Structure formats: C-alpha cells, structure tokens
C-alpha cells in the first residue's frame, strides 16, 4: 500500500512527544520511505522534538507557530528551497485555553473562542494555502478531528465547535483543491492519552465510556491512527477526499 510513498516529501505539524498522534503518523510515513519535515511550535518543545526527529534518519525539524502567518510563509519558503515539491501535509494542531475546557460552555469567553478557532481551524486553511503551490503533482492533506464535533461530550466545549469548523473546512478545501489533485481528509480518532487530551476534564471517564460502548470493546491505539494517516497519504486512498474517517473501534455508530 505504501510503496508509492517512497521518495515523496511530507510535512508533519503537531509533534509534541512520542505519544502524539502526529508522531505516530510521522513514523509510519518515514517507514514508507517519505522524506519528512517535522515542525514544533516553540522553543519549549524544541528539545524533545529534536530528540524524536533524530531517531528518523533524514528527517528535519523546523520551528513554526501556526497562529502566525509570517512563520507559516517563512516555513514554506524554506521547504520550497529544500524539497522543491511536497506531497503530504499532516495537520495535527489544536488548542483552547485550559479554562475553556473546565468551565461551563455558556461561559466561553470571546478571547477563548477566538484562540480555539484560530489555532485549531484557521491554521489548516493557512497551511493549505501555503502548501498548495508546492503540491504541483497533487497530494494529500490530513487533519485530526473528534466525535464531539457531532455529539455533546461534556467539557469538550469550544474545542467541539472548533472541530465542527475544522470538518467543514475540510469539505470546502477538498472542493477547491480538487482541481489541483490535492485531497483533503480528516481522521476522527477515539480518545487517546496524548498531551493535548490531558487538558480535557474527564478524559479517564471518556476512555472508560468508549471502551464499554465501542463494538470492538476497547479503545483505539495511537498506532492504528498512524496507519490510517499513512493510508490517506498513499495512492490507495486516491479516490477519497472531503471525508471524515473514523478510527474509534466503532464507537461513533452506537445509538445508546
């Protein structure tokens, strides 16, 4: 399935540590033969990211705060110079101020709302716009969403609104970039103990609930999400765009 990825170039946004979904996808893409550019948000995350990147021969690291247009533009100018063409973009970026995930949704602040949608949604649009000129042979853009975009998950709050906006953005980007043979899809993973997920109140209860209700009787493993990312990057998924692919052990199909 992944042999067609040999020698292609990918950019992975959102690697925080070895437990992150972005890292699992990066490992899979590297194993499939892709050349990787891996970004980290700031200096605080730089050392851990660099240690991880060093474990993937040939991979390079770049600092990029996706809430700043100038940094996105600078990154892609650098990538154009170093790689020429890009084939895959992995966008695994989401953030809301911690207090917005603890308070009642009705008390969401204007600033918290703005930050959540800017970082979690607009960044995908900004990255896609910057990447498209380098994806002249077509390619795949993959982002990460969650079931709370459709149904109420207590305390997911404004992040659920952001995920709904992200999924809508996926459809519009898929429509507009389709003429360039660029596919855009989202993976909706079940809850996983990642750095980002730890900021959500009641994560333990979410994991327990998923395990009890999912048809497969367990929670999804991060490696399974990583494999799905590789699939969406590969030509095996060449007819799939504008979709939300669930990797949640079937939890989303349950009605009770």
Positions of predicted regions on the chain:
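Short C-terminal tail/terminal secondary-structure segment
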Residues: 229-230, 241-256
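Short, small/polar-rich loop/turn modules that mediate ligand/substrate recognition or access, typified
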Residues: 178, 183, 240-242
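Canonical Rossmann dinucleotide-binding motif of NAD(H)/NADP(H)-dependent dehydrogenases/reductases
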Residues: 3-38
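Catalytic loop of short-chain dehydrogenase/reductase
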Residues: 14-21, 94-129, 137-179, 191-193, ...
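A short hydrophobic alpha-helix cap/turn motif
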Residues: 30, 84, 135-136, 175-180, ...
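A conserved structural motif in NAD(P)-dependent oxidoreductases
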Residues: 214-225, 236
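A glycine/serine/threonine-rich, flexible loop-to-helix segment
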Residues: 50, 179, 189-214, 254-256
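Conserved mid-core segment of classical short-chain dehydrogenase/reductases
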Residues: 64, 68-73, 77-82, 91-114, ...
């Amino acid at each position: 399935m992944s042999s067609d990825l040999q020698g292609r170039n990918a950019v992975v946004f959102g690697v925080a540590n070895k437990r992150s979904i972005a890292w699992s996808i990066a490992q899979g893409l590297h194993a499939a033969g892709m050349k990787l550019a891996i970004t980290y948000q700031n200096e605080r995350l730089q050392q851990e990211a660099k240690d991880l990147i060093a474990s993937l021969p040939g991979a390079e690291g770049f600092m990029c705060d996706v809430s700043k247009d100038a940094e996105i533009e600078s990154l892609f100018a650098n990538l154009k110079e170093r790689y020429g063409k890009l084939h895959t973009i992995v966008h695994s970026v989401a953030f809301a101020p911690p207090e917005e995930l603890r308070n009642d949704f009705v008390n969401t602040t204007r600033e918290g709302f703005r930050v959540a949608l800017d970082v979690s949604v607009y960044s995908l649009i900004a990255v896609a716009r910057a990447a498209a000129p380098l994806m002249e042979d077509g390619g795949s853009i993959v982002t990460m969403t969650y079931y709370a975009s459709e149904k109420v998950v207590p305390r997911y709050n404004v992040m659920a609104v952001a995920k709904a906006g992200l999924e809508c953005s996926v459809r519009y980007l898929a429509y507009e970039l389709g003429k360039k043979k660029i596919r855009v899809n989202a993976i909706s993973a079940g809850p996983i103990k990642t750095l980002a997920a730890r900021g959500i109140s009641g994560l333990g209860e979410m994991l327990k609930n998923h395990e009890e209700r999912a048809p497969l009787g367990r929670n999804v493993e991060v490696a399974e999400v990583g494999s799905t990312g590789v699939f969406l990057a590969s030509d095996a998924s060449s007819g799939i765009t504008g979709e939300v692919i669930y990797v949640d052990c079937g939890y989303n199909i349950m009605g009770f």
